[in-house]
């Protein structure tokens, strides 16, 4: 964007939003068993939403409704895009007013100072870290390995993901953007100062990211490209626990977003569910909260039951699920719901086969659990990644992981 007199380029105004339905092979556009990017929903290449101040929503609608897996709610997508465009316009006007009041040069100078403040903060923090080289591994529930070697020295933090397994057969593949998001988040935790999030935090951080499930190749044809939705919401969480482990500042948090998606031809619903956070030196973990790579609020029970074919019967803290230690990990959540009409259910979760790790002698948190109680009396234990067709009166029970404990129990 430019200053109001169009004489100086000031920067960009941008926003990012989740669109809960973008097509794909199952309602909610998060199919747990997708084998290609195309099966996860409509793939839109870089496209102008406005051109010369003229909206192009007709062209966008054609892309949203394109075969083979069109959006089930294109009208919602278009409304959300209009809201995002309005937010950008508001941001543009605010920045232009700032430049008009104080001068474009002054605004640019302060932007530079904010970035430099972040760079200085991580530089100071690096001087307090013990120089050396540490390697950590984490395994997804299916055994897939994530590996990072972190080296501190010469005023730098170097992170090398060599040794991470190759392309994932499912949708737990990530992208360099996801990896960088996890890294900058961990760097911000290390800094532990009220520094605005900006690129300056990465000034003294180097990332080596070979071809692997964190950096796969993407052919032009979406039907041949790897799926990534699990990488975005689940691998990202496990990456944070992986990167925190060598620094030893906190035990593992739940390491999952507990993605729950259900829908049918008339509706689609998606939520993420909190859990326990890890304990650390001098503090217990928090109960029943979101952590790390997600901060979404959950739908109010009244709204959930009014708009969707489901009855929420229990939403409670999962007692004693945090890892024991001198300081105890936070407890997870129990969420139980009964469906009132047939729906397609998808679950995309982690830490069901193992609990989030403890540190310094602390115990791991309890793994998550999930199962169905069918109306015919049958009980079905559900895997970390699951898809089921449900009938009216079927009951779903989800128990999310607790956080890891810190320190040996005295």
Where in this protein do the model-derived segments appear?
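Glycine/proline-enriched, intrinsically flexible loops and inter-domain linkers
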Residues: 1-410
